[in-house]
């Protein structure tokens, strides 16, 4: 007890003692005439002793409300006694050294910076300045300066810059004194005006004298000198001066010397300081030239290679990489023009916009490169990483609409009712009386094709498949290590297109003798197990197609002319894909050489096995697909069919995880690119594929890969062989455009096994990609398909996305200069020799595939239950029809009451695929269509609840011709909804007309949803429209929370968040942006008056939450999302009409709470995406200069704010999630 009391007394004594000492100083400051130097010296010495020994003393002096800091600074300002000044400076140093941030800020707020600079000025005027005073004073200024934002200006105005610089000049041999002086100069150089001022006064030359070759002496001084020198060189004037004096060569020599002698890596910071100086100099053009002339590329490349083995030297490797990439000469794309290789003449010419500008350019203009390409003097201040720049913009989003008048929705049809009557014929359901229909009987009509098809949900396994088979299949498929015994397949023959059906028999006999038999070997276990994969019980008497070859007979492949001029299309495809044989038509571009020429008795078994996929692909008919392709009109007039589109895709039976990116992979790829300049003799640089040069044919050499993209939705413009197994690929621009390079779909053949092939797509435009965050490209192998694995699967290792050295001309960037393209690079080792493989950005879904699926759905549906109508809404610019679908339930009878109920069902309007490269939108739509046409109770209930009007492909021309974003008009159709042109944007004009017609007859849809894909976010989510949430984000109106708005727009997303595993409510946004005012979502909400108007975005990558966390998205999951959307609409009806169905009271209460949820929830905007793309441990910037802004020409690719929404209230779903439909999921 006495010990505690003694401690308390001691603390009290210490506190009272420091207060007493400060009171004495305060009295002296109040009465300057009574100033006693000895007493002041004694008091400050005592305070210094206490500050050095006791933390409580330091806290007391700087405590909030304490006058200790003011008293000490006031004493410093008034005294002229040297020892007193030194005592006070040391006191302040002690305060700044511990818990420095807060205490230094307190010192600055009391005017400490001004007092210290004045003291420096007065001390310099002394005839003989005290070295200790200057050292202590500069040491304190070096700590205060970084915390004072105006320190640089204060130092320059007070004249302190010259004082510090002169001290360095006069004391070059006194490291103890000049070290703190250099620290102060380093802080002052953060101000660009100060840097220029110091440079004019000889600072560049002085600092360079302090830098030298390897030494073990004064390393601290050398480190600070280098940091100060690097800061000084950020001024372009100083950098030019350094170049003129030959400092670039000298710095490279110094760096090499330190690298050679610092074998234990103890002086890594000095070596990095030298690199920082080079980095500052190479911000200017002459600096980059001097670096290259001094052989800097090779010097840094060699030293970096030696450093890569030591992880602690990564900062040196990264900085060296950044310098080399910056100095890598800017190259033009090896193209004659950046405009599309395909030309399409528009019916009318736009008067303004990018297309008009494109056509107004004289033919002689070189649009690939311009004089800006190597004139980008990059200021160091702008070299923040792109993620940080995006993060800074989180504070404010100027794109959010602030005009309340524009936010208030209202029906503005813009067309008269008479004009809109042209759309009456697309709504036969409103006038149909069903008098000619027999609706009394529930029995199906004779001859109708019935038999439900099960749509598999992504999370369900088929019970018919044995566990041992699934484990074995998953083990083999996940490793992509497929047995050699399944590699072999028949020869595919390329037949001349001018052969007619006449005389096929004779020609077939002639060819038959020349066909090499290919051997197959299938494990009997695989055969037995695959027979069980059918989702329907196989019919015992399944009829064979016309021309089908018996399973007992050896299949004979006959050539057939399948060009579009063939008169008898039916016979053309008889033998193309038969029940027990499979053969690509002559439309398929490439032949395949079998692995060996030996024949096998198991050929028959292999061919029979392929028939199982008829059951897995009920909506796929290769013969029908060929017929549809012949009538599909493309600008290049394609005459070939890609094998995956012909044969079909079955979702693999294994999950594909997001790829974990190995450390250092991006850096390794960058160094391989740098080697192109350092070792130019190793570069082959041979064009192996070129759409612009029809004479460029595939090489006959067996070591060279062969490429092709001349088929529907294909996109690959040019391929250049760089090294033996490395190829640069260039994508084609959208037609009538000079950019939008993202979608790719091409064929590769002639590969060898065990060889790692590197593919670089070098003209990408977006500043980042999900390829950096786990996404892989897709591959389809013909040999795998013939071995009963006909699916697209994720492939590729060492995948990364980074800025390259190919420059974008200002013509392609809307006037912005100095921008570069980006590279997607991936490495693939093919499992089969001489295979034919296809690569795609995402799962392809062509226009012909859509038409085939619609025809199959129509033929499979039950006409007594399902009201299905397919009509052509309009003809596109390219001459292709745009289908519009009507789906609902047939009335119970043709009695008036039932017909009246049929006609008065609310409308749901859906659309999809306005952007051709977003193929996932079509797969989601496929899931929706199959569910709606299904025979399950839920599907029937949904059809009885709504009339569905669906435009499944808004941009057929763009899809057909391999565009990524535009139609043939060269414009983004999703930016034309405000004022679509009937000649240039017919599909948008007439789709909007359908909606306007519904609004005009007072049948405004309950829900409108446009299906899209998102390339830079994970999960599935929705964008909606809300006045209140938009105003809330602008902070323009503090009373925005008092606004009254129906929160029903949130109901459907909340329901989907409960139903769909891939859906994420936290990624949804209901903010209206200015840049999105002409999109379908906003126009339908504002002009048509649909409150529940949405864009549903599906990831191209995968999920980071829920059931599919860390998995890449597949077609099974996408189709499941489409089906879950339908279930969500059924739940929406129950939520908005809870008394319509008999539900448990508890469920009704919870569902009502969902509707009444508060609108105070903050919703993210669609601006910046940070958490979805976290930084890597590997601190390598994917861009060369790290100064990328969001792409102005791609405003809709910008990410979202971090979600601040409250956690949504959930409820259990008792719905049956397994849906049985009359269309089978593929």
UniProtKB/Swiss-Prot annotation:
Task: State the source organism's domain of life.
Answer: Eukaryota
GO-annotated biological processes: C-terminal protein deglutamylation; cerebellar Purkinje cell differentiation; eye photoreceptor cell differentiation; mitochondrion organization; neuromuscular process; olfactory bulb development; protein side chain deglutamylation; proteolysis
Q: Identify the cofactor(s).
A: Zn(2+)
Q: What is its main location?
A: cytoplasm
Q: Which residues form the active site?
A: 1097
Q: Which UniProt keywords apply?
A: Carboxypeptidase, Cytoplasm, Hydrolase, Metal-binding, Metalloprotease, Mitochondrion, Nucleus, Protease, Zinc
Question: Could you say which EC number(s) this protein's record lists?
Answer: 3.4.17.-, 3.4.17.24
SUPFAM superfamilies named among the record's database cross-references:
ARM repeat, Zn-dependent exopeptidases
Concerning Gene3D superfamilies, the annotation shows: 2.60.40.3120, Leucine-rich Repeat Variant, Zn peptidases
Listed GO CC annotations: cytoplasm; cytosol; mitochondrion; nucleus
Cofactor binding comment, as recorded? Binds 1 zinc ion per subunit.
| Molecular function GO labels | metallocarboxypeptidase activity; tubulin binding; zinc ion binding
| Pfam families associated with the record | Pepdidase_M14_N, Peptidase_M14
Amino-acid positions noted as binding Zn(2+) in the UniProt annotation, renumbered to this chain: 915, 918, 1012
Q: Compositional bias (Acidic residues) spans?
A: 366-392, 1182-1194
State the reactions this protein catalyses: (L-glutamyl)(n+1)-gamma-L-glutamyl-L-glutamyl-[protein] + H2O = (L-glutamyl)(n)-gamma-L-glutamyl-L-glutamyl-[protein] + L-glutamate; C-terminal L-alpha-aminoacyl-L-glutamyl-L-glutamyl-[tubulin] + H2O = C-terminal L-alpha-aminoacyl-L-glutamyl-[tubulin] + L-glutamate
In which compartments does the protein localize? Cytoplasm; Cytoplasm, Cytosol; Nucleus; Mitochondrion
**Which residue range or ranges hold the Peptidase M14 domain?**
843-1133
Where are the annotated segments for Disordered?
366-400, 1182-1201, 1206-1226
**Similarity comment text for this entry:** Belongs to the peptidase M14 family.
- What exactly does this protein do? Metallocarboxypeptidase that mediates protein deglutamylation of tubulin and non-tubulin target proteins. Catalyzes the removal of polyglutamate side chains present on the gamma-carboxyl group of glutamate residues within the C-terminal tail of alpha- and beta-tubulin. Specifically cleaves tubulin long-side-chains, while it is not able to remove the branching point glutamate. Also catalyzes the removal of polyglutamate residues from the carboxy-terminus of alpha-tubulin as well as non-tubulin proteins.
Q: By what name is this protein known?
A: Cytosolic carboxypeptidase 1
Gene expressing this chain = agtpbp1
